[in-house]
């Protein structure tokens, strides 16, 4: 047999080079485009998990304990906001506040803007904090440093949204996980995971399939409905492929 190098110039341990022919699971271009004709990935949007920058204050195994300490955090913030009203600015706020609670850039900016906070018990919700570890998280924009795209994936009346996730960084090898609860930013490590949900939601709360029409068409063309399956004595027709299947 004639030996030829693979597409990467390897003569030994030849590799399969069809990876780039696979359908992308998600891309920045598909995420950003407003045109359906330019979508070229399985999922429309994706997001990192909720980044609180104060897990010790807004995450807990007990919902009651969570609300107690979050209420204390809010009360202390409001006391500082009242004390420093018309005094704090972006340049001096870090030197003026008392550090008996966890201050972050967002919370300092809210204080400078004269904003006061109020506890909302509906913000306490179940979340997947680490693989196979669920906690209660206070999911509120003011007390979470970054939501990324989570407002479109987990609006406040949506407790579960099936997702798959993956991560590949400096601290651990390629890892995948599936779940349905609100995910934490550091679910695997400080290398953030990307979460791809089954659904997304518009500003009015309407549920939209997060799997693109383009991807559905690719699968329908490849796995044609009615094609006889193999691998069993009795052949059965394949079921039509839909986004719900």
Where are these regions (language model features)?
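Sequence-level detector for compositionally biased, low-complexity segments
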Residues: 1-245
């Amino acid at each position: 047999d004639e030996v030829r190098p693979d597409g990467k110039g390897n003569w030994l341990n030849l590799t399969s080079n069809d990876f780039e022919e696979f359908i992308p699971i998600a891309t920045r271009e598909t995420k950003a485009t407003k045109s359906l004709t330019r979508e070229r990935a399985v999922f429309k949007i994706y997001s990192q998990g909720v980044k609180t920058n104060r897990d010790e204050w807004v995450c807990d195994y007990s919902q009651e304990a969570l609300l107690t300490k979050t209420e204390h955090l809010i009360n202390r913030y409001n006391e500082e906001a009242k004390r420093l009203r018309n005094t704090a600015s972006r340049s001096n706020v870090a030197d003026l506040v008392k550090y008996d609670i966890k201050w972050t850039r967002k919370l300092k900016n809210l204080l400078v803007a004269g904003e006061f906070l109020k506890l909302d018990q509906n913000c306490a919700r179940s979340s997947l904090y680490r693989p196979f570890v669920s906690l209660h998280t206070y999911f509120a924009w003011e007390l979470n440093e970054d939501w990324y795209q989570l407002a479109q994936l987990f609006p406040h009346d949506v407790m579960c949204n099936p997702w798959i996730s993956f991560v590949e960084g400096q601290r651990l090898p390629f890892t995948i996980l599936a779940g349905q609860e609100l995910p934490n930013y550091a679910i695997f490590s400080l290398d953030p995971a990307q979460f791809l949900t089954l659904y997304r939601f518009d500003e009015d709360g309407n549920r939209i399939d997060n799997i693109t029409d383009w991807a559905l068409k690719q699968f329908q063309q490849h796995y044609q409905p009615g094609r006889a399956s193999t691998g069993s004595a009795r052949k059965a027709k394949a079921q039509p492929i839909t986004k719900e299947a």
